[in-house]
Amino acid sequence: MNKMSHSEEFAAGEMNAIRASVWQLLSSLYAKELSRERICELAGAELWQAFAAQVELQASASQIQAALAHAAKYDASQGGDDARLELAADFCSAFLQNAEHCAAPYASLYLGDAGKTERNETASYDTESQDKAARSLYGEKHQLMSDYLRSAGLGLDADFREPSDHLAVILGLMAHLCTSATEESQRAFLESAILSWLPEFNARLGKLKLESPLYGALGDFTLAWARLDTELLGG
């Protein structure tokens, strides 16, 4: 293999930093509800327009920007907090309800035994199944991500009280790998830890009846970005 020139190394490093920033942004959007300041910051960001220039991201990026701009403009014009509270309610409905009724953002619920229960197309979801899903949140996938974090010298914020297989944690770890791991390692993690369950998660998210299109579009964007990043890594 030919050694890269300094200019090629710089370009690769710059691209990896950009990729890392996208993954980190997505991680933050799944981690907690948006504050008024964060809504205004993201609504005015030019990055959504930049994303919209990429055909795979165009539709979802435009929807995200429009939803954020609407929320920021509405609250500013009304001098209130109604749009922010609506988005907070959507966040709760999308990610914080019982796993039967939301798109629970935990890898454990889509992979392994719990995932098999979750993928059942029938409407039944008995107490035993719920207990099994609850136990799995701190089971194998949680432990696997905890091990990943430790090996990378990372940890969770004290105020983030979620299992390590939460989507926000996994996306944050992907951001870290963009600038610290080989392309082969990044692609392997992306395929095994993210794309192995993200399509099913996004399908569930898309079926929810939410007030704003923000989180549905966020799910579409996340999946499209994950697939695009796999291509960037030569997958």
UniProtKB/Swiss-Prot annotation:
A single GO BP: protein folding
GO annotation, cellular component aspect: cytoplasm
Main location: cytoplasm
Cross-referenced InterPro entries: Chaperone_TorD, DMSO/NO3_reduct_chaperone, HscB_C_sf, TorD-like_sf, TorD/DmsD_chaperones
Annotated TM spans: none
Keyword vocabulary terms for this entry: Chaperone, Cytoplasm
Subcellular location as annotated: Cytoplasm
Pfam family of the protein (one): Nitrate_red_del
Stated role: Involved in the biogenesis of TorA. Acts on TorA before the insertion of the molybdenum cofactor and, as a result, probably favors a conformation of the apoenzyme that is competent for acquiring the cofactor.
NCBIfam families cross-referenced by the UniProt entry: PRK04976.1 (NF003442)
PANTHER family documented for this protein: CHAPERONE PROTEIN TORD, CHAPERONE PROTEIN YCDY
Family label: Belongs to the TorD/DmsD family. TorD subfamily.
Protein's recorded name: Chaperone protein TorD
Source organism (scientific name): Shewanella amazonensis (strain ATCC BAA-1098 / SB2B)
